[in-house]
Regions:
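Long, low-complexity, intrinsically disordered polar/charged segments
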Residues: 2, 13-23, 53-69
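Glycine-rich phosphate-binding loop and adjoining beta1-alpha1-beta2 segment
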Residues: 2-44
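Electropositive phosphate-/nucleotide-binding environments in soluble metabolic enzymes
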Residues: 30, 34, 145-153
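E1/E1-like adenylate-forming module used to activate ubiquitin-like modifiers
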Residues: 44-51, 58-150, 160, 177-189
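Oxidoreductase and adenylate-handling cofactor-binding alpha/beta cores
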Residues: 152-166
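Core catalytic loop region at the nicotinamide-binding pocket of NAD(P)H-dependent oxidoreductases
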Residues: 165-177
Length: 189
């Protein structure tokens, strides 16, 4: 398991991270990947951490067999996706767009699977452009429930991919909209 992230683990991260960090852990302000490695290494062996992934070090992905991606939009994300495409590796990319209107949040969660057989469709769905100045998510707003739901939807999609869950639809792209509680699937087989 390879973890990539250059963020520092601060109080706003604690609300959406597994477990409950101590005040001492928060004061130490470790890298987020080091905090998560400490938790997950109690259950898994072979976890390695890297502070960042971008066009300069995508070779760190050599040898992977699958990837979950939750990367800020930009050229670094494009380089990672091009690398996993070249490796022939399936990925699941998640994203979230939020807006604040009249003091109330609304938004859409996205889960997109890219396999060697659907690269073109997936590339149309994966965003490389950030939310700009209206991007509420970048303000560290606390939406742990939406982060968790997006992660769970990604894991369910992966379990369908490996045959654990039945997948009659074969959807490769799903969105969840908070207003109306709508879960929509697209790009099926």
């Amino acid at each position: 398991i390879r973890l990539f992230d250059d963020d520092v683990f601060l109080q706003h991260n604690a609300f959406r991270a597994p477990g409950a960090p101590s005040i001492e852990e928060l004061r130490d302000a470790p890298k987020k990947i080091d905090y998560l490695k400490g938790i997950y290494s109690k259950m898994h062996k072979g976890i390695t951490t890297h502070p960042a992934i971008d066009a300069n070090n995508v070779g760190l992905l050599d040898g992977i067999t699958f990837a979950f991606l939750c990367i800020d939009a930009g050229e670094g994300k494009r380089a990672v996706i091009e690398k996993v495409d070249a490796l022939g590796v399936s990925i699941i990319d998640v994203g979230m767009g939020l807006e604040l209107v009249d003091g109330s949040l609304g938004g859409i969660l996205r889960v997109t699977m890219s396999t060697p057989s659907n690269r073109a469709q997936a590339r149309e769905r994966i965003s490389y452009i950030g939310g700009g100045e209206k991007d509420v998510y970048s303000s560290s707003i606390q939406v742990a429930d939406l982060n968790a739901l997006n992660a769970v939807l990604a894991v369910i999609k992966w379990k369908k991919l490996i045959g654990f869950y039945r997948d009659l639809e074969g959807e490769q792209h799903s969105t969840y909209t908070t207003d109306g509680n709508m879960l929509l699937n697209g790009d099926g087989e």
